[in-house]
Regions:
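Helix-turn-helix-like N-terminal two-helix hairpins of bacterial/phage DNA-binding regulators
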Residues: 1-63
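Interfacial/linker helices and their anchor residues that mediate assembly or domain coupling
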Residues: 64-95
């Protein structure tokens, strides 16, 4: 589960393995090993993934199945924009 979540979040963010490796200050082969499930990232890196991708560490670890957006790092304007987008998509989904 962890390996799939790391790969999925990286791909959804449009990052290559090399880009993620640079952001985490690790090698690309480390990222590749994590995504293949050959090795497991330390707790420190799980927390860094959560912060980088704005999700909970529980989601990354597979404890939660729903991806929840951590909005604590967004400012009020960004939160309002996210709220407006959710309302828009919810309204249009009903049609």
């Amino acid at each position: 589960m962890l390996a799939e979540r790391i790969k999925s979040l990286r791909q959804k963010s449009g990052m290559s393995q090399a880009e993620l490796a640079r952001k985490l200050n690790v090698t690309r082969s480390s990222v590749n090993a994590w995504e293949l499930g050959i090795s497991t990232p330390t707790t420190q890196y799980v927390v860094e993934f959560a912060n980088l991708f704005h999700v909970s560490s529980d989601y990354i670890l597979g404890i939660e199945s729903d991806m929840k957006l951590d909005i604590s790092k967004f400012n009020e304007e960004e939160i309002n924009l996210i709220y407006d987008l959710v309302k828009y998509f919810d309204k249009n989904k009903m049609k």
